[in-house]
């Protein structure tokens, strides 16, 4: 096997793609800052107990594990940054009020989450801690849609769900944990035969309501059907009210309600949202409320947030990241060096052609050039090549 090959679903990021990813990363982090979010940089690896705290079985399967040569304990390479940020909020910052945090960094997965999907996503996201009200969820939803807009993605569809609906139904009669897992999978895939089989032993009202959930999918009018057809439980009413409020604050995004899309049920504790764009089968961003994550660190706090994979978003973003640059000849002239240094100090990209090498027209858009006039070096428009 050639020694330059990389593991399956792992790839280098080449200059053109890296420029685009970095442009989007800067745009989004700058956007988060305008909302008051503070940047944190958690480590790439942690003790496995910390990485997997309060996250459920799925993240355990995704996490690379190895033995720490210093302590002998098992450590993991992070597969999700969200639990790390929850640890920072709960244990390190230890603030009493609202905390807004954001992050951007690579994560590693033992298996790809789908076809042609990298095992090294570049995860970027934002979290609010300390406010249990729907206002925090509304802000996160708004920020997620603004981040996708900053990436140039139009015609975004927002899918909304609320784990409180199923939680209220399951509270009516106990369901074994292993059956719950199968139940969630059947709901997510809308597998009606499997769902009927799994709920066969439940009380009739509970069984019928759970089997109804996959059909409660579509526009905002689904909420009215859900109110009419689901049991009149206070928790269900509150969940539907929350979804109606989120839908009303979706801006220009189309809204779908899907009361069976319960991926991450064990992790989330309230509203869940996912953003889709035309031509892409999977969600480009996901978020929701997860109030229980901080419990493992001794300090449960209300929490809500979203994240996305920058590499995936960059692959579908129309943003052009080919930077404008100034071309300069190679010369030992001190005045030229002074002119170049002055331009670079203002943020301009100035590239000198090395002797015998033409400028790289592919990687940069040379729209200007440094030319000598009367003993001075001045910036002039660059004439297009014939």
From Swiss-Prot:
Q: Which GO terms describe its biological process?
A: histidyl-tRNA aminoacylation; L-histidine biosynthetic process
- Give the chief site where it resides: cytoplasm
What pathway does the UniProt record associate with this protein?
Amino-acid biosynthesis; L-histidine biosynthesis; L-histidine from 5-phospho-alpha-D-ribose 1-diphosphate: step 1/9
Q: Which residues cross the membrane?
A: none
Q: Which GO terms describe its cellular component?
A: cytoplasm
UniProt entry keywords in alphabetical sequence: Amino-acid biosynthesis, Cytoplasm, Histidine biosynthesis
Query: What Pfam family is a match, any one?
Result: tRNA-synt_His
**Beyond the main fields, what else does the record say?**
This function is generally fulfilled by the C-terminal part of HisG, which is missing in some bacteria such as this one.
How this chain assembles, per its entry, is: Heteromultimer composed of HisG and HisZ subunits.
Function summary:
Required for the first step of histidine biosynthesis. May allow the feedback regulation of ATP phosphoribosyltransferase activity by histidine.
HAMAP family with a match to the protein in the record: HisZ (MF_00125)
What name is this protein filed under? ATP phosphoribosyltransferase regulatory subunit
Gene designation: hisZ
């Amino acid at each position: 096997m050639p020694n330059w090959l990389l593991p399956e679903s792992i790839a280098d990021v080449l200059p053109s793609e890296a420029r685009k990813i970095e442009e989007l990363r800067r745009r989004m982090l700058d956007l988060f800052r305008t909302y008051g979010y503070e940047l944190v940089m958690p480590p790439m690896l942690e003790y496995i107990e910390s990485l997997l705290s309060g996250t459920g079985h799925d993240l355990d399967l995704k996490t690379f594990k190895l033995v720490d040569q210093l302590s002998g304990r098992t450590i993991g390479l992070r597969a999700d940054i969200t639990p790390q940020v929850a640890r920072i909020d709960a244990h390190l910052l230890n603030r009493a009020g609202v905390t807004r945090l954001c992050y951007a960094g690579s994560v590693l997965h033992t298996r790809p989450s789908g076809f042609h999907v990298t095992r090294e996503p570049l995860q970027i996201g934002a979290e609010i801690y300390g406010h249990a009200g729907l206002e925090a969820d509304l802000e996160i939803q708004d920020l997620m849609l603004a981040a996708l807009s900053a990436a140039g993605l139009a015609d975004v569809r927002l899918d909304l769900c609320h784990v409180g609906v199923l939680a209220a139904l399951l509270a009516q009669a106990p369901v074994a944990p292993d059956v719950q897992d199968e139940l969630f999978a059947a709901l997510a895939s809308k597998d009606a035969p499997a769902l009927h089989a799994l709920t066969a032993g439940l009380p009739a009202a509970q069984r019928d309501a759970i089997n109804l959930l996959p059909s409660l999918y579509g526009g905002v009018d689904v909420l009215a059907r859900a109110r009419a057809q689901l049991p009149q439980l206070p928790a269900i009413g509150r969940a539907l009210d929350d979804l109606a409020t989120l839908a009303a604050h979706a801006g220009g995004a189309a809204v779908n309600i899907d009361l069976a899309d319960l991926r991450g049920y064990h992790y989330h504790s309230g509203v869940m949202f996912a953003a889709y764009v035309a031509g892409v089968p999977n969600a480009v961003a996901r978020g929701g409320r997860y109030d229980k994550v901080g419990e493992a660190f001794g300090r449960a706090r209300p929490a809500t947030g979203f994240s996305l994979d920058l590499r995936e978003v960059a692959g579908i973003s129309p943003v052009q990241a080919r930077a404008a640059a100034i071309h300069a000849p190679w010369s030992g002239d001190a005045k030229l060096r002074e002119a170049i240094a002055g331009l670079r100090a203002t943020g301009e990209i100035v590239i000198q052609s090395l002797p015998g090498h033409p400028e790289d027209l592919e990687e940069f858009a040379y729209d200007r050039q440094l030319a000598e006039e009367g003993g001075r070096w001045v910036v002039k428009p660059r004439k297009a090549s014939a």
